[in-house]
Amino acid sequence: MAPGKRTGAAKGSRHNKKYWRKGTDITDIEDAIHDRSHQAATGGIVEDMKDEEIFVVDRLPTSKKTEEPQRTRKQQAALEKITRNITQEQVSLPKPTGKVLKKPAKLPRGNAILKLKAGVKKVAKRQEKEPKFDVWNTDLTPRIPKEKLDNPEAVEHFLKVVKKKQPKTPGKSITTLLPAVEVAQGGASYNPESSEYQEYVTRIAGEEQRLIDSEEKTKRGIEPQWEKVTTEHERFLEMAEGLRIHPNFNKNDEETTTTVTQEGTEETVKNGPVTCERMTKEQKKKKAKAAGLEKDEKKRLEEKAREQDSHNVYRTKQLHKELDEEEKQRHVESEARKKKKLLNKLTKRQKLGRGAFVEAEDPFLLKEELTGNLRQIKPQGHVLDDRMKSLQRRNMLPIGGTKAKKLKTSLKSKVVEKRSVKEVVKGSRVI
Amino acid sequence: MKDRFKQKYTAGAAVAYMSRKQALKKLQLTLKDFRRLCIIKGIYPHEPAHKKQANKGSTANKVFYYRKDINFLAHEPIINKFRDYKVFLRKLNHLKAKKEDEKIKKLYDNKPVYNLDTIVKERFPTFGSALRDMDDALSLCFTFAMLPHTRVLKEGMIDSCRKLTAEFMHYVIESQSLRNTFISIKGIYYQAEVHGEKITWVVPHERGLPHVTDVDFTVLVTFVEFYIAMLGFVNFKLYQDIGLFYPPQIGQVVEGDEMESEEYKEKVYSLAKPLAKRKDVEQTEDDEPLDLLGEDSDALAQKVKEAKNIKTLFKGCVFYLNRECPKEALTFIIRNGGGVVGWEGAPNDLKADSKNITHHIVDRPMDKLEVNRLYVQPQWVFDCLNARRKLPTERYMPGVALPPHFSPFTSEKAGDYIPFERLEELRSMGKDVSELEAAIPKTMDELPMRRKEVKPEKPKGIHIAVGQMHKKSKEKFHETVEKGQELKMRELMISKKHQRVYHSMKTTFKRNRNDALKLKKKAKLVKATAEA
């Protein structure tokens, strides 16, 4: 039924039941039922069928094949070369017709796939552990066979250049005399003798106490001992002085004023009278005389020394002897000094790097922690820690430290244009 | 004529030393690589005598090296390997980002590795010099063998540490060269005498090692890397010397693949079974020197005698270890003394109820004891080695409070307080303790009693008596007084400089003496109360 064209009951109001029964358009449904029954009669209902039953995959090209681009002969040859089947067995080149001058060319060498077929497998390099050998009885110096290079000097030079041969090792000096492994003291035994343990523990306790003391000392140095801190209340009192809110306002006005004046008088400092006393004639005379005597004495001593020097001519032998002795003494002292210096170098920690060496703390167990049997032992300290410290003590490792930050001594200048300056432009009026 | 001045800092300390920064610049290496190179090549920093000179006028604390050392380092081919490695890492990063697994695998196969053989020989030109540096190597490797593997600590490194240390222990066992042990709370110290060199090392206790924070592992790993190479060669040479197969073989000869198996490794690491010896090497028994030297009190003879005592310490004994005992340490010591060790699950699988067990090592209270074997606590084994004889087992029975464990590394000074037990031990080791004993101060009751002379009663009244000689003791008294005075005079003559040292020395002597006396009295008191 075409829209807008209504007949019969359909002409009436759509609100009534009558319209529902007569006026409803049911052609769609009837068509659908008809379709369905027709489909069922002819082959099967399309909706229920699977995709494969209805559709066929189209494998034929729909569009025309794109034309191959025109290639030159050279291009074509190159293309063939890269696309040819390299697995194909290659036979020797065809025999040339006519006169044979050269031998037939061999098969190209780089046919990896053929080689693979033939059974030659290339295995990736594996870093196998080489068996150990006696290094101290084998000659490890690199060599070049004589037929390759027979000039020994040239061989030497070549090996050095390619870093196969090393130059002579610089003389190694002994770095330390300290033992590599320092055995723990008897007191560190897992089941120590009581006196040894006591000794060991008191030493550690003493060290600890010293550390605590030094820390306290620095703390004392840093913190002011009698620092007065103004509290909020005191500040308030000060600000409210003389105001009505002050708790002591007008309480004993007179008393305070009197005390203030008294304090004021006490505080003024009086300088003593400056006097300028002159020496009396007698005193002056005395002083001059003393100076004269001193001068005379000096002169006399000088004279005496000169005379003694003149006598020294006669005791040159003695003087030589004395000088010899002095020299000998000095030599002995210098030798001792050298020895001490060397010993210090070999036994003491050198300053290597910025950091400071911190001595390892000896591990210990408390008396109640000493179980006395191996099963319940409580291990203390770490061996690696010890090793590290030992290496540092033997001057084998530098000790790093943080670099001290430098404070800026000069500040950068910054150019700022003030607003008041900025406002002044060409043509602005100066008031 | 105008004087030509020498330029500053062109000679002396300024040229002989080189700061680390300069060295890095010269070698074109990163700091990390330079550190590794220095450790591997054994080149250490030095503090210049004239620091300001070496530092071109500055007094900053820098790390200095000898210039000749750095020049020598510049020729090292390993530097190129370091550079190759840098390239390798870069490539790896690139490929990983692209997720090209095939290529990554290939790259790993061609990872640049360096060989330390020549460096080992260069640093230790002789075998003896390598042995002298074993302390460090062993201590580090024994510790590393116990660590878990991390990003820095590669698994392969820990495995090889374990392998090499086990091999070394096998050598010590076979050559019976362990001399001293000491159980401290840090770990167990061992001392062996190999080729006349005393090698001391420490092994941590068999517990999980605590975490350490202030240790730079990258540094230690580099040390270990070198020591692994060195220990391999040293072990090989040591094995060769006493006619053992290297790598070690147990029982029948096995081939490469089997040797890599976990089971076989465990067998070797347990130390319980003796190693197979090569047939082509003659075994030499050197008993002759002892007979030649005779029973002298000579130090050498003493040493040889001690060595022989240790070799036959546990001969003919079969030890069973209870499962709570530290197996490695005990097996090591017992087998070093010629004993046989076993436990449940060991390669020789000794059962607890086996008839031929002579000693049963227990570290916990036991309620069921068998009759025909001795029960001891682990400390007995350690103390026996230190004493060089089998100690009586009564004091080491399970459940008994053990006697103190002394360190064999401490040497007693005359005048110190030496406990009674230690004196006994020293005496049993055949050392001359008379001097030490004499120096121990005597308590009042030990001093010879002064007998009171009984004076004959004087008869009362007037009498005649035989004339008496001048008393000799009085003369003696005068003599001592004179001696004392003389000493005092001599003390006065000491220069002021030395006087202080002299007095401080005297007071320390006195203090030590008093301490020793006090301790001795205490010990006596304790003994008396224990007896009562």
From Swiss-Prot, chain B:
PROSITE patterns in the record: BRCT
Database matches in Pfam families: BRCT_2, Pescadillo_N
GO cellular component, one term: PeBoW complex
Keywords for the protein's UniProt record, in alphabetical order: Nucleus, Ribosome biogenesis, rRNA processing
Gene Ontology terms, MF aspect: ribonucleoprotein complex binding; RNA binding
Record localization: Nucleus, Nucleolus; Nucleus, Nucleoplasm
Membrane-spanning ranges: none
PANTHER family: PESCADILLO - RELATED (PTHR12221), PESCADILLO HOMOLOG (PTHR12221:SF6)
Family: Belongs to the pescadillo family.
Protein's name according to its UniProt entry: Pescadillo homolog
Organism per entry: Caenorhabditis briggsae
Lineage of origin: Eukaryota, Metazoa, Ecdysozoa, Nematoda, Chromadorea
